[in-house]
UniProtKB/Swiss-Prot annotation:
Heterohexamer; composed of 3 copies of TIM9 and 3 copies of TIM10, named soluble 70 kDa complex. Associates directly with the TIM22 complex, whose core is composed of TIM22 and TIM54. Interacts with the transmembrane regions of multi-pass transmembrane proteins in transit. This is Mitochondrial import inner membrane translocase subunit Tim10. SUPFAM superfamilies: Tim10-like. The keyword Chaperone applies. InterPro entries: Tim10-like, Tim10-like_dom_sf. Gene3D superfamilies: Mitochondrial import inner membrane translocase subunit tim13 like domains (1.10.287.810). The gene is TIM10. It comes from Pichia sorbitophila (strain ATCC MYA-4447 / BCRC 22081 / CBS 7064 / NBRC 10061 / NRRL Y-12695) (Hybrid yeast).
Length: 90
């Protein structure tokens, strides 16, 4: 009641800004994933009209590694944030 001791209220505009920022982050991550895995796995000459088995396997592994790495980095950053070491704090 009266905003004492409760969680602060977030306006609709703040929610929209947060959603847009999250969408931008996810879109950026997706574009980075596509760029990296495409340049690593897809032959530049495009000799076949379809993705080869070798390219598909490479793409599968590349995407899996990318997401595994993101999870590991996220967990590490969360631990640093909880311990106060994130952003140069010790």
């Amino acid at each position: 009641m009266f905003g004492l001791g409760g969680a602060p209220q977030i306006s609709s505009e703040q929610k929209l800004q947060a959603a847009e920022a999250e969408l931008d982050m996810v879109t950026g991550m997706f574009n980075q994933l596509v760029d990296q895995c495409h340049s690593k796995c897809i032959n530049k000459s495009y000799g076949d009209s379809d993705i080869t088995k070798q390219e598909a396997l490479c793409l599968d592994r590349c995407v899996a590694k990318y997401f595994d790495t993101n999870v590991q980095v996220g967990e590490h950053m969360q631990k640093l944030g909880q311990s106060g070491q994130f952003m140069g704090r010790k």
